[in-house]
Amino acid sequence: MSATPAVLRASACSACRFSALRLFVSSFATPRAPLPAARTRILSPAVTYSTFRPSPRLLASPAIEEHAEPAAQEQPNKIEDAQAEANKAEASTETSNEGGADVPWYLQVDAPTHPTLVHEPPPLPDIPEGSPKLMEPLVKFVSDELGMDNLDLLDLRAIDPPPALGPEVLMLFGTARSERHLHVSADRLVRWLRNRGISAKADGLLGRNELKTKLRRKARKAKLLGTTGLPSGADDGITTGWICVNLGTIGWSDMEMEFKDENGMTSGFGVPQSGTTIVVQLMTETRREELALEKLWSGILRRSLERQDKIDGKLPDATFTTAPDTVSRSTFLRPTPIRSSGRNRKRPDRLYFSTSARQHAKAVDVSQTDLATAMAGWEYSNASPSTIDNLLAQDTDSKVQLLFQMQDYLYSLPKDQALSAVSLCEDGSPSTFMRLFNRAIENLPSAQAWEARLWLEKAARALQHPDHGLARLGDLIQEMKLSGAADLSREKFVDFLRMIFAIPETTDAGVRQQASLSMDVIDMLFSRGEKVIEFDVVVAVIESLLRTGVRTPEARRLLTQFEDLLGEAQMDCPTEDEIIRLLDVYAHYRAWEKFWNVWRIFPRYCERRTERMYTKVYERIAAVDHQAMATDALRWCVEEMWHEQPPVRVTPAMLKALEACIRIADPEAESLAKDIDDRISDAQYMDREFVRLWLTLHGSAAWGA
């Protein structure tokens, strides 16, 4: 019996060959069925196909092979070869199974693991010598229990003066895997510290239920507003990416002790500033790369060590000398004095600091050449340098009083000597004035220290110090954002905006840098929950831009944007000082259309314009010496003055400015008004507009003065 072509084609692969062979052989032992009718089939040409392994016996054969279909006469030989190969494969499989069954599973040798595939936890940072006992378990807890990655420990105890965080700072950094991991880990860390008697403050932490509440409120607000939420990149108050856990100062002593000078005499009493401040910075990976706090604090530490190396631990002789050719204090801008205790401003949301120490402070006697006599005129004038050093280290009131005296001393110097006082020495070390200033602000409360630093920056800018430019202001802004200036008043932030735009820039790139720095300051205001689009901010930017001169297209575009806010933005009513400053700067640059637009701001808020504002307008119009402008101003403003509620009374200063405007509008009005006799009515003279105004003003000035 011969195989049909269909059977031969079905036995193309090795498995099909074996199955077809069994069917072919078994056909001899069974009765033959009647053959079906013969059908003509068209043989297709030889094709290529892939073989596969359907049974374990063929595991040793190649996975994929390409074959060409052989001719019909070669098929019987192929079938015999396939049967022989299958028998060999089955025999080898059975042999391997029998051999493997003899070895129990616990004696089978596993394949060796490559050393690089074994996971080893990263080493923990080394604990600095002299650290508190809490540091080692804290580092292990943050690494093992919280699962923070990339731990880094910075020893900042060598920074002099110490930062606002506290003395002897040790800062631990860790990276969280996600925002949720960050908040959960910080919450566990605070609870772990609380169990050990440490009350830590975690800035940026959302509690266990607070996050759910904020998300629920955000979704409800988005539903009510018909929006999907805040735009991308906006601060939603939920995604922080950074939590600062401040453990406070470990080992702080609140016991008062007696201080003695080098002669063994009692110099005072106070609480010593001791202990170590521990701060744990937990951040997400992207936030950590963005802030780069390690780089910032490492740079601060390096610069502090460089200064200490230059000083070599010894203060040189002071160079405080007064010269007879001192310039007046009006030569450069005098900033607002430093204050230390709270008191309300004109607006309830503005606070400032004041102290009674200012009333008792005397002028600094700068005729000596050492640190102790630089404090002469104070109650500690006979103390030794070590006594002064101890007092400045412990007594906050003494530091504030010293800052007041240094302020007065700087204003008493000629401009060139004042510039040298706020500069570095030839060897790169700070001057005696700057060294004493740094010592005075050391360990002061954050608000007082920043007020003192901003005062010094403003004084240096007024002196046109070359090192106090935009780069210096940018460094201060970054330090404020990272070290914290939460207690600083709003007025100081506005002063910072004035300092930024008070630097004249002649290129568009410089103006864009100013705009970028101003946005950083505005962002800090926004993070405090204060309104940023307000008249004090807008007026500060407009005034500074106009006074420095608008020299570039970018500066003109920026000025136009802020001027548009005066009439379009929904802001609170400005103060009297803000309106007067805008009137001054627009009158100085002869921008009269904008001048009158500012004059009409108060009526838009239904507010009464004051006597001081009317006086300023009349003075500015009189200074121009233009008849048409003086005539229009008198016709508009005098009539509006009578219709204010209550009416504005004429003060002596206002009367003087009005007389000057009348002389410009009608030069003969004054002489005609004086020549009119009370007994004789001259209708020709009385009908003149400004003659009647002159007589009316002099009649009302008596009761309005």
UniProtKB/Swiss-Prot annotation:
Transit peptide: first to last position: 1-31
Membrane topology: Peripheral membrane protein
One GO cellular component term: mitochondrial inner membrane
Main location: mitochondrion
Stretches the record annotates as Disordered: 83-102, 330-349
GO biological process: mitochondrial gene expression; mRNA stabilization
Cited Gene3D superfamilies: Beta Polymerase, domain 2
Subcellular compartments: Mitochondrion inner membrane
Biased composition (Polar residues): 330-341
Key words, A-Z: Membrane, Mitochondrion, Mitochondrion inner membrane, Transit peptide
Function as written in the Swiss-Prot or TrEMBL entry: Probable mitochondrial mRNA stabilization factor.
Entry's family note: Belongs to the ATP25 family.
UniProt-recorded name of the protein: ATPase synthesis protein 25, mitochondrial
Gene, per the UniProt record: ATP25
